[in-house]
């Protein structure tokens, strides 16, 4: 267990970008600590792998294949969520390029995902949360 002294029994957590990497690790750690988890990613294959691991922990797990920069998709997802206690707004990207070589289009994609989508999701999450909700926004902007 990643979080020995941390318990979130019967809480509902939503983790964006949870098909791989940090998001996957957060989703699994929250399930190990007792949470039911809603996972979001663009790749269904990755989500199914994470969902199977969470279900082996005897926790509920639902998933949504989506592009979190698409506000219409995100609004639809949040319209289906009745309860949310924890948000890990993990989806993010960067452009590993010299600053002088980054194209404006690429920078716009980074801003759309790392800033605008994170804002939209956090704002929508506040409409379905219960008191003492935890919002985590680990996305950082790196140029």
Roles of regions detected by a PLM:
Residues 1-11:
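Flexible N-terminal pre-Rossmann segment of NAD(P)-dependent oxidoreductases
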């Amino acid at each position: 267990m990643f979080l020995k002294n941390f318990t979130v029994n019967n809480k509902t957590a939503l983790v964006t970008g949870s098909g791989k990497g940090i998001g996957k690790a957060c989703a699994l750690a929250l399930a190990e600590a007792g949470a039911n988890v809603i996972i979001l990613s663009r790749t269904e294959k990755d989500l199914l792998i994470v969902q199977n691991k969470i279900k082996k922990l005897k926790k509920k797990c639902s998933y949504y294949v989506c592009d979190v920069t698409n506000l219409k998709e995100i609004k639809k997802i949040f319209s289906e969520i009745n309860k949310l206690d924890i948000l890990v707004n993990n989806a993010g990207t960067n452009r590993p390029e010299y600053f002088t070589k980054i194209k404006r289009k690429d920078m716009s994609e980074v801003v759309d995902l790392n800033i605008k989508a994170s804002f939209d999701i956090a704002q929508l999450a506040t409409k379905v949360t219960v008191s003492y909700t935890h919002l985590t926004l680990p996305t950082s902007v790196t140029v």
